[in-house]
């Protein structure tokens, strides 16, 4: 009688639970793709049916209809190069995160300038030497006056806009 050798290293079948986890991960990725803007979807290596399904997703408002559509997107995701899609999404998330960090840093500069006086202005000019100190001082004084009189922060917005323009010039974006 022939002996039967069970060699597990040759065949590694996925359990039903593992398959379900992978399919749910594809659905989650598909749901994440539905939140992207259409111009970003154009950059992704997607098949036409999937691209169409992703663009139709916002039309489904009812909970069950949306859930069913996400499941359909998950089914279409099985035929995709998921690694390339994830890499591009990570790149977009990273650039968005960097933009938000820079935006918050500029907001902190604005708040320090309005609250801090000459010491904050000197520190800012040290960071941005191409700054028109007199113009910035006028904007800051106007913003301080508005804050003291509980007026809308129009001058604070102008301070932020000027700071952002200086930052973009410094980083070569202008």
Curated annotation (Swiss-Prot):
Single GO MF annotation: ribosome binding
Keywords associated with the record: Cytoplasm, Ribosome biogenesis, RNA-binding, rRNA-binding
Highest taxon of the lineage: Bacteria
GO CC annotations on file: cytosol
Subcellular location(s) per record: Cytoplasm
Key word rRNA-binding present: yes
Coiled coil: none
InterPro entries linked to this entry: DarP, DarP_sf
Major location category of this protein: cytoplasm
Pfam families linked: DarP
GO terms (BP aspect): assembly of large subunit precursor of preribosome
Function: Member of a network of 50S ribosomal subunit biogenesis factors which assembles along the 30S-50S interface, preventing incorrect 23S rRNA structures from forming. Promotes peptidyl transferase center (PTC) maturation.
Protein family: Belongs to the DarP family.
Name of the protein this chain belongs to: Dual-action ribosomal maturation protein DarP
Organism: Pseudomonas aeruginosa (strain ATCC 15692 / DSM 22644 / CIP 104116 / JCM 14847 / LMG 12228 / 1C / PRS 101 / PAO1)
Lineage, top ranks: Bacteria, Pseudomonadati, Pseudomonadota, Gammaproteobacteria, Pseudomonadales
């Amino acid at each position: 009688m022939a002996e039967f050798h069970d060699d597990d290293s040759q065949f590694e079948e996925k359990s039903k639970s593992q398959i379900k986890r992978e399919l749910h991960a594809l659905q989650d990725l598909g749901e994440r793709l539905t939140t992207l803007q259409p111009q970003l979807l154009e950059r992704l290596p997607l098949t036409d049916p999937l691209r169409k399904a992703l663009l139709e997703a916002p039309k489904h408002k009812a909970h069950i209809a949306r859930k069913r559509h996400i499941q359909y997107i998950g089914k279409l995701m099985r035929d995709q190069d998921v690694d390339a899609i994830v890499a591009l999404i990570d790149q977009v998330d990273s650039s968005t995160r960097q933009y938000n960090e820079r935006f918050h840093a500029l907001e902190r500069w604005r708040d320090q300038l309005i609250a801090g006086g000459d010491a904050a202005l000197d520190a800012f000019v040290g960071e941005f030497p191409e700054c028109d100190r007199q113009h910035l001082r006028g904007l800051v004084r106007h913003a301080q006056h508005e804050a003291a009189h509980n007026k809308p922060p129009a001058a604070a917005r102008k301070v932020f806009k000027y700071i952002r323009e200086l930052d973009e010039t410094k980083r070569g974006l202008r």
